[in-house]
Regions:
Chain B
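Flanking scaffold residues of small Cys/His-coordinated metal-binding clusters
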Residues: 3, 234, 248
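Composition-driven, intrinsically disordered low-complexity tracts enriched in small residues
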Residues: 204, 248-251
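Short Cys/His-rich micro-motifs in 6-15 aa windows
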Residues: 258-266
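ABC family nucleotide-binding domain
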Residues: 3-220
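Conserved beta-strand-loop-alpha-helix hinge in the C-terminal portion
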Residues: 222-237
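Short cysteine-rich clusters marking metal-coordination/redox-active sites
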Residues: 239, 253
Length: 470, 266
């Protein structure tokens, strides 16, 4: 029966008190455990958003720069030219890492943002007047884009939302010379096999994503909407726009999707980039119903957007650092609270047990014996608090962190439920051995700190006075 | 080793209560021989407990000196004093002062823990001491399950744990009923008679004191007189009341019939 047994028995002697103190300590410890986790989660989601955004913008910029002479004409009603508008960019990716990385799949743009085409079909015969004989026009390429997907119903805030998630996008382009050879209508980054070429039919060029979806490779046959095609090559997407896109001959695509004579997009190439706006004006004048967007417009939109995201991200970063400051303050408060709880409890305990201390001194306990007895009790209690703190922290980290930390959402102007979802940070306290050890070490250290003075006082008690103490 | 266990010379103790000086002890001289059982008598406030605290190294005197086993304890630092307390002195308190969260055996083991005795040895000796005070069966009981008398026996066993040179008992019967009171004084007298344990007991109970060997009367911090108790007679085989021959084990004098040892009726 040593000093440890006595400490344990003393703690268990007043069960309710010990329980209350342990729970109070537990909450302080839980704050200490969950706040860093919350900060980390926010940092990670900001970082992943930053890298996703900058990757996306670079890719898009590159592909736009390659096609600066392009003018897209479509009947699209879904968006005015550019994919990144309004709610589309509320970035589910900021819902605390849970969606980070899944930031804005191209499907959310409704079939490819830079096709500009939505999927509103237009009768090709109505637009034969948009052709290479127009002033400053070098070529006109009719394109059919059809997005094939499935419905997904998600429940948020008690309401069901249905949206279509694209599995793949079929893009039919005229595989004729010289269009195929002279204009950027096919992907340039071929990673396996070969690109499509003039005269190809019954063959497809898959994206890397498509090969996974269909489970095929170069040389294999692939069945698309009931028809069999041969895979001649695989392209690595050059931007988010064509990640899901497979290319085939326009007539194949029209037949396959029952769109004979239909297209979704006219890609008009100007003689040179200086003529782009006059070409766009010409076409708009001819066909006011068409939505005409130049890649130059897109590029400047993109650049404007890049600047605005830059400042939004800067805001996010400053919020994160402000959050770190808040977190530090809260941790300091939690640390102080933990020490103070232990301090007052042990001070009270020492007073309460003055006679016992006197007795122990009378029968030969040294000051050090007594001090270590009380120190051990304080540290044991704190360790119990530490264990409870890890449990509470594990269970309530998201709640605690969202209660105690400022929210980070750089795109809070974007409306819609996804934005609301972004505020419920998915913060998790991962109970790793390191965390357990760190929490217990912190608990022990704070317990020792809080007990130091009361235990020292106990050790200095004069036995004769202690014995008189009532 | 000298015959005198405790030698008190010109001992004075003054307390300061605010601006008032209280002379608790003044010029006390007292010698206690090895194997003696001395009781210190006196009314409340006569300085009995102060004297005992100074003798037991719980308090320091204002002047004078105390030699405990030939060692002057009045000049010692707190660090040296706890060593003296754990090895030379055994305390018995009026309120027993057992630790409520330890059982009888564990309470008796406590002082042995201070001197670093191995656990098995502590346990063996604690059980032996509990048997000696008649509590072998109650060793694993916590204080709250023991009667007051039993608790005081545990406290006496605890005081004996480190084989101290002297037992200092502060009103050991003060909180006990008549029956337990006599059991305890009998136990102390027996320990003194049979084991030769030196005991100094403070009490204000005349009758209890009369069963000890020597009674010292303290009044206003001074020793006013001394008187022999029945235990002195028992040791000399002579009745202290009539002078008739008695044996140390006799409970009453064969000649005059007066009680030599405490009985329940007494």
């Amino acid at each position: 029966m040593g000093v440890l047994t006595r400490a344990v028995r003393n703690i268990s002697r007043r069960k309710t008190r010990a329980l209350l103190v342990v729970v109070a300590l537990g909450f302080s410890m839980a704050i200490m455990v969950s706040i860093p986790a919350g900060v980390t989660a926010n940092q990670l989601s900001t970082q992943s958003l930053t890298s996703n955004l900058s990757g996306l913008i670079t890719q898009t910029e590159t592909s736009l720069n390659q096609t600066l002479t392009e003018v897209d004409c479509s009947l699209s009603l879904r968006f005015q030219g550019f994919g990144f508008s309004g709610g589309q960019f509320s970035a589910g990716g900021f819902a605390g890492g849970s969606q980070a990385g899944g930031f804005m799949p191209p499907s959310e743009f409704g079939g490819g943002p830079f096709g500009g085409g939505g999927e509103a079909a237009m009768n090709a015969s109505l637009y034969t007047d948009v052709n290479a004989s127009l002033p400053d026009v070098a070529a006109v390429v009719p394109v059919l884009q059809v997005s094939i997907g499935h419905n997904v119903t998600i429940e948020r805030f008690g309401r069901n939302f249905t949206r279509v998630v694209a599995d793949y996008v079929i893009e039919g382009v005229p595989l004729v010379s010289p269009l195929v050879d002279d204009y950027p209508i096919l992907p340039v980054n071929i990673t396996a096999g070969r690109n499509l070429q003039a005269g190809d039919s019954g063959v497809v060029l898959l994206s890397e994503n498509n090969t996974g979806y269909f489970g095929v490779g170069v040389g294999d046959n692939v069945t698309i909407l009931g028809q069999t095609f041969t895979v001649v090559g695989v392209h690595g997407a050059s931007g988010v726009s064509d990640r899901l896109t497979l290319y085939m001959n326009l007539s194949d695509a029209q037949a396959l999707t029952n769109n004979t004579g239909q297209i979704t997009l006219l890609k008009v190439f100007a003689d040179n980039s200086a003529d782009v706006s006059s070409v766009a004006n010409e076409i708009s004048a001819l066909h006011p119903e068409l939505t005409v967007v130049t890649n130059q417009q897109r590029l400047s939109q993109l650049q404007a957007m890049q600047a605005s995201y830059g400042s939004a991200l800067q805001n996010a970063e400053s919020t994160v650092s402000q959050m770190q400051a808040t977190a530090t303050q809260e941790i300091v408060v939690a640390v102080a609270a933990t020490s103070l709880i232990i301090f007052f409890l042990m001070l009270y305990t020492v007073r309460e047990r003055t006679r016992e201390i006197g007795t122990l001194k009378a029968i030969g306990f040294s000051g050090w014996n007594i001090m270590s007895q009380f120190m051990l009790e304080g540290v044991l209690l704190s360790l119990l608090g530490g264990v409870v703190g890890i449990i509470i922290g594990y269970a309530t980290a998201p709640m605690l962190a969202s209660l105690l930390l400022p929210h980070v959402n750089p795109f809070n102007s974007a409306a819609g439920f996804r934005n609301a979802a972004a505020s419920s940070l998915s913060i998790q306290v991962l109970v790793t051995p390191t965390l357990v050890l760190a929490a217990l070490a912190a608990a022990a250290a704070l317990g020792a700190l809080g007990t130091l003075y009361p235990a020292w006082r106990a050790s200095r008690t004069r036995p004769a006075e202690a014995m008189r103490y009532e | 080793m000298s015959d005198v266990v405790l030698d008190v010379e010109h001992l004075s103790k003054t307390y300061e209560l605010g601006k008032r000086h209280v002379q608790a002890l003044s010029d006390v001289n007292l010698q206690v021989k090895r194997g003696e059982f001395v009781s210190v008598m006196g009314p409340s406030g006569s300085g009995k407990t102060t004297l005992l605290n100074v003798l037991g190294c719980l308090d320091t005197p204002t002047s004078g000196r105390v030699l405990l086993d030939d060692v002057d304890v009045t000049k010692m630092s707190e660090k040296e004093l706890y060593r003296i307390r754990r090895s030379k002195v055994g305390f018995v308190f009026q309120t027993f002062n057992l630790l409520p969260y330890l059982n009888a055996r564990e309470n008796v083991e406590l002082p042995m823990e201070c001197v670093g005795k191995p656990a098995a040895e502590r346990r063996r000796r604690a059980l032996e001491l509990l048997a000696k005070v008649g509590l072998a069966e109650r060793a694993e009981h916590r204080p709250q399950r023991l009667s007051a008398g039993e608790q005081q026996r545990v406290a006496i066993a605890r005081a004996l744990a480190n084989e101290p040179a002297i037992i200092l008992a502060d009103e050991p019967t003060g909180n006990l009923d008549a029956k337990s009171k006599h059991e305890i004084i009998k136990l102390l007298a027996d320990l003194n008679l049979k084991q030769g344990t030196t005991i100094v007991m403070v009490t204000h109970d005349q009758q209890i004191a009369s069963y000890t060997e020597r009674m010292v009367y303290l009044n206003s911090g001074r020793i006013t007189r001394e008187k022999q108790g029945t235990l002195a007679g028992r040791k000399k085989h002579a009745c202290p009341y009539c002078g008739g021959k008695i044996e140390p084990g006799d409970e009453t004098c064969g000649t005059c019939g007066k009680p030599l040892m405490p009985t329940e009726e007494a």
